[in-house]
């Protein structure tokens, strides 16, 4: 064999080997990417369920506090008007007029 032919065959063998490793590498990379996408989706689902429950707890606390405030405000409001209606002049005795 001539040196050029031997060099060309060796170069082609190296290129074929590199190409095979590249294909294997891309297959490995693809499987790792698929695994990472699946893992990130699982983590996102878990975090969203935790966030939903945290949001529900915060919303429940907010609603409880504001309803308690509204109930207190309403009772003060009704007490004032109840007191207003209770102090009707007809119910109160008239003072004696001294002459």
From Swiss-Prot:
Sugar-bearing residue positions: 94
Keyword Glycoprotein: yes
Gene3D superfamilies: Apolipoprotein CIII
Post-translational changes noted in the entry: The most abundant glycoforms are characterized by an O-linked disaccharide galactose linked to N-acetylgalactosamine (Gal-GalNAc), further modified with up to 3 sialic acid residues. Less abundant glycoforms are characterized by more complex and fucosylated glycan moieties. O-glycosylated on Thr-94 with a core 1 or possibly core 8 glycan.
Organism domain of life: Eukaryota
One Pfam family of this chain: Apo-CIII
Annotated spans, Lipid-binding: 68-99
InterPro entries: Apo-CIII, Apo_CIII_sf
Record-given protein name: Apolipoprotein C-III
The species this protein was found in: Mus musculus (Mouse)
